[in-house]
Curated annotation (Swiss-Prot):
The gene is gmk. PANTHER family: GUANYLATE KINASE, GUANYLATE KINASE-RELATED. The lineage of its organism: Bacteria, Pseudomonadati, Pseudomonadota, Gammaproteobacteria, Oceanospirillales. This is Guanylate kinase. It is an enzyme of class 2 (transferase). GO terms for molecular function: ATP binding; guanylate kinase activity. It is found in: Cytoplasm. Keywords: ATP-binding, Cytoplasm, Kinase, Nucleotide-binding, Transferase. CDD domains: GMPK. GO terms for cellular component: cytosol. ATP binds at A16, P17, S18, G19, A20, G21, K22, T23. Residues 9-187 form the Guanylate kinase-like domain. Gene3D superfamilies: Guanylate Kinase phosphate binding domain, P-loop containing nucleotide triphosphate hydrolases.
Length: 215
């Protein structure tokens, strides 16, 4: 059997309209499945109460962000709700090379850019069960006025119009069921032939070694 290269992690792209429950699903996935983590993005938006720099985001000013764009530091970047967001190329590659699975929580624009750089990335889109449910979730946050909610709904419809650019779609109607589907996708990816051959090369070599004849 040929020697396999070191095992590398899988890159997951997870997108959804605001209010579809993507963040909650990903957080629950991290608690359920080992060996996977979310990439910490850069952003120019203001830090919210309870957030920590380097944990939730790398918070930078616009000038710094634009310098990082010019130097090619980002796999993807986009402007969302009047703020920049971007993903560090070096940070993601280092995690993948170490065999860590990585999740990118990004919008459809960023997803297109990532697929160009990582053609083996697994893309997943989270949809709400209905527009009414999505509106109720956005309004239920209690942090936005009616005009802001209306704008977020328009942006959500635009985001959802790109669902068919993704390999997998999960409808988040019942949270536990959606989480099961997301977990199954990760576990199934870990049983794909190239990864199994890389991670279990010694076992496979031992199983397939020649059995000596018994006199």
């Amino acid at each position: 059997m040929p020697i396999q290269p070191p095992s590398k992690g899988t890159l997951y792209i997870v997108s959804a309209p605001s209010g579809a429950g993507k963040t909650s699903l990903v957080r629950a996935l991290l608690e359920r499945v080992a060996g996977i983590q979310v990439s910490v993005s850069h952003t120019t938006r203001a830090m919210r109460p309870g957030e920590q720099n380097g944990i939730n985001y790398h918070f930078v000013d616009v000038a710094t962000f634009e310098r990082l764009i010019e130097s090619g530091d980002f796999i993807e970047h986009a402007r969302v709700f009047d703020n920049y967001y971007g993903t560090s190329r070096a940070a993601v590659q280092a995690l993948l090379d170490a065999g860590q699975d990585v999740i990118l929580e990004i919008d459809w624009q960023g997803a297109r850019q990532v697929r160009e750089a990582f053609d083996e990335a697994v893309s997943i889109f989270i949809l709400p069960p209905s527009r009414e449910a999505l509106h109720a979730r956005l309004a239920g946050r209690g942090t936005d006025d009616a005009a802001t909610i209306a704008r977020r709904m328009r942006d959500a419809v635009d985001e959802m119009s790109h669902y068919d650019e993704y390999e997998h779609v999960i409808i988040n109607d019942t949270f536990d069921h959606a989480l099961d589907e997301l977990s199954c996708l990760v576990h199934a990816q870990r049983t794909r032939m190239p990864r199994v051959q890389a991670e279990h090369a010694p076992l496979l070599a031992a199983l397939l070694s020649r059995v000596e004849d018994v006199e």
